[in-house]
Regions:
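Glycine-centered coil/turn sites that cap beta-strands in beta-rich domains
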Residues: 146-161, 165-184
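Beta-strand signatures of extracellular beta-sandwich domains
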Residues: 63-65, 182-186
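Beta-rich carbohydrate-recognition modules and glycan-binding surfaces
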Residues: 1-144
């Protein structure tokens, strides 16, 4: 929640026992987002959708967006009383599905997302709303799953790519048996 613009609400989740419910505090705007502790790579979802369910008064305009680790922000508009991205604005629970190519904008780095979901209202509307079922879909297909339990007969050094944004990298390798290993990195 940004700058104390929202407090806990009382709207029950759409389904199950968990959801998000907030009430605006009358600050003239409100904003909040779902932020990961480390940047998330959602590049495989570039042709997918950001989906969510929301219960919000029909007369409240809002924006849904994403923010990358570089501070780039991009939003799509949900005008009051208009069906947008499949969300029917009647004050009841409804679902929206935003194509990632539309919410991404020109500068969002999907490989380094800090906020995977942001809601923002800037017209000063006071309201209570609920969010549920926030997820990204269409991230590609698994091409092949191999469940081979074969025993290694040779050393294997897997591809290792350092993260240029972090001084640490993980180096994965396999050896044919148990034992002490001395690894030197140049």
């Amino acid at each position: 929640v940004w700058e104390g613009t929202l407090t806990d609400g009382s709207i029950d989740p759409l389904e199950g026992e968990n959801g998000i419910s907030w009430s605006s505090t009358g600050s003239g705007w409100f904003g909040a987002g779902i932020m990961s502790m480390q940047p998330i790579n959602l590049f495989n979802f570039s042709e997918g959708h950001l989906n969510f369910s929301i219960k919000i008064p029909a007369n409240v305009s809002f924006q849904i967006g994403i923010i990358d680790s570089w501070g780039n922000q991009s939003y799509v508009d949900f005008p009051s009383n208009q069906t947008t991205y499949g969300l029917v604005r009647n004050g009841n629970w409804g679902q929206a599905s935003i194509p990632v190519e539309e919410i991404r904008g020109d500068y969002i780095d999907l490989r380094m997302l800090s906020y995977q979901f942001v809601i923002l209202e800037v017209n000063g509307a006071s309201c209570e709303f609920g969010l549920d079922d926030i997820y990204w879909s269409g991230g590609g297909e698994v091409l092949k799953i191999s469940n081979s339990n074969s025993i290694l007969d040779r050393f294997l050094l897997n591809d290792n790519y350092p993260n240029p944004f972090n001084p640490l990298t993980t180096i994965n390798y396999n050896i044919p048996g148990d034992g002490f290993v001395n690894t030197t990195i140049y």
